[in-house]
Amino acid sequence: MAKYSRLEVAAVMKETGMVPLFYHADIELGKKVLEACYKGGARLMEFTARGDFAFEVFSELNKYALRELPGMIMGVGSITDAAAASMFMQMGANFIVTPSLREDIALVCNRRKVLWSPGCGSLTEINRAEELGCEIIKLFPGSTYGPGFVKAIKGPQPWTSIMPTGGVSTDEGNLKGWFDAGVTCVGMGSQLIGKEVLANKDFDGLTKTVKDTLALIKSIKSVES
């Protein structure tokens, strides 16, 4: 079962401003990535369940995080149906991220008070997700919509919390554009945990990148406030 409630997870998303995304079939490599991100200050990790036996990999990574990385909140992304969401919640997923708005997933997550973040691409979808109890809207793909879309939504709906995924990088200008538009946090995958990092096993470099990116986000948010 989830260790953190949806409100606790949402609070950490807002506080840190970033959710790293990662998938790899190698459990030991996954542990190294988790540790590197944790050392860099990340306290959230979205494991994107895109490969065969991904549930086995997540189960081991979550056990590792619970045992060795206190405060690391593990969630699962790329979930497309309620059955998969339920299975990963049984393995301790603290949040569920989906590429589209699925009401069946909303129901199973809400029963357990687990945060779910559906991929939305219109104000109508965002409104429906919030009616279903969504705390954090995933804007996907972020590269298609851009900061201008976020700013337009936040005008009439300043209460809406948005997390763009896709089209987000560690570049200062990119991050400033998103946070100036009013996002709550950003999801970052290959731009943060790149193929070269994994191929070269440059975990110290990953720790530095995570640390620098979180510091940059904190700086941008402090100027806004």
What are these regions (language model features)?
Residues 81-91, 124-132, 169-186:
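Catalytic cores of alpha/beta
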